[in-house]
Amino acid sequence: MNFVGDTSIRFADKVLKFTGSGKMKRRIFILTDFAIYLIDPETEGMTRRIGLAAVEKVCLSKLSDNFFAVIIPTEYDLFMASTRKTELVQVMVDVTKTASDYDLEVLLSNRFEYNASASLVKEVSFEESEEGIKTRFKWK
């Protein structure tokens, strides 16, 4: 795989990406000096490239779940799950600061909105219960 303009891979992990319709897709998340790449592990093809300069913020809950959202105002957002969520977000913050001297906003909240597609906004909320952490989605 050729990452044009990128000099090094800073982080890689297997993630679950949630589509606008709520389906889960396995993806390989690759973070380089300048972009996020999502790779389909079955076809080994790139499904999406997002320049880090386009990322406004990363949202994650205050609970010990695996969910996070990457907010991209010029496109639809990414809602994903990773067992290495905290590490992934920290590396994104560090890489963004190094590449552009910009402090990437990290929103810690048990409720936030994201654009699941060009025309669909979803609100996700996280709640701790006796059974574990409950995740709820609401179409806006």
Task: Identify the residue ranges that each predicted region occupies.
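Eukaryotic phosphoinositide-binding membrane-targeting regions
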Residues: 1-27, 31-140
